[in-house]
Amino acid sequence: MNIEEMKKIAAKEALKFIEDDMVIGLGTGSTTAYFIRLLGDMIKKGEVSDIVGVPTSYQSRLLAIESGIPVATLDQVDAIDVAVDGADEVDPNLNLIKGRGAALTMEKIIESRAGMFIVLVDERKLVDYLCQKMPVPIEVIPQAWRAIVEELSIFNAEAKLRMGVNKDGPVITDNGNFIIDAKFPRIDDPLDMEIELNTIPGVVENGIFADIADIVIVGTKEGVKTLER
């Protein structure tokens, strides 16, 4: 089973948690894209009804509309029943690093308010500790990026401004901000680090999602496995 197949089976497993009349937070990224398309197929087949999606990015909003999912913004709904998204890393306590898609701020806003937060990953994303493989994305006010990179050196982080692909200059988030990718030696206390990073002036939000995931669905070569907090 290849990586894309692992992503697909994880996305398909998440559909088991979807019921009629749900408001669903729709994450951003390649694995979540499979879920959005499959959810759209369920709606078209009449297998589920009265679904509203709350996208975390323009990308997921466009895909949801294309897939036939009614969409709304966060301020148009009373509550989020379930949120579904991917992750860049998952540690043994189900703490996450997210934000390779540069949508981390809205992802955290929506997913922290969900009645249930389901994370979809392939087996490569499971790590022994956060920052084992991937840096922590940090959304920052553009004028503050250089000062923040300097301040991150206190944490022995290798930090750099994320540059765009197929465009000149830095990546610009949906909120009009920059992304700094910070590679720490390791993160042993994700919640403490998440809080501390957000105290740096100019930081909008960071990609550590501590104590927030309820269920992690993992696509593996042998099939699907589900991890619960």
UniProtKB/Swiss-Prot annotation:
Q: Which InterPro entries match?
A: NagB/RpiA_transferase-like, Ribose5P_isomerase_typA_subgr, Ribose5P_isomerase_type_A
Catalytic reaction equation(s): aldehydo-D-ribose 5-phosphate = D-ribulose 5-phosphate
Q: What does this protein do?
A: Catalyzes the reversible conversion of ribose-5-phosphate to ribulose 5-phosphate.
Q: Which SUPFAM superfamilies match?
A: D-ribose-5-phosphate isomerase (RpiA), lid domain, NagB/RpiA/CoA transferase-like
Coiled-coil stretches, from where to where?
none
Q: Name one GO biological process term.
A: pentose-phosphate shunt, non-oxidative branch
Enumerate the NCBIfam families for this protein: PRK00702.1, rpiA
Subunit structure, as described in the record: Homodimer.
Tell me the pathway: Carbohydrate degradation; pentose phosphate pathway; D-ribose 5-phosphate from D-ribulose 5-phosphate (non-oxidative stage): step 1/1
Give the positions the UniProt entry annotates as the active site: 107
Name this polypeptide is given: Ribose-5-phosphate isomerase A
| E.C. numbers | 5.3.1.6
- Sequence similarity: Belongs to the ribose 5-phosphate isomerase family.
HAMAP family found in the cross-reference section: Rib_5P_isom_A
Is the keyword Metal-binding assigned to this protein?
Answer: no
Enzymatic class: isomerase
Which PANTHER family does the record associate with it? Answer: RIBOSE-5-PHOSPHATE ISOMERASE
What are its GO cellular component terms?
Answer: cytosol
Supply the Gene3D superfamilies for this chain.
Answer: 3.30.70.260, 3.40.50.1360
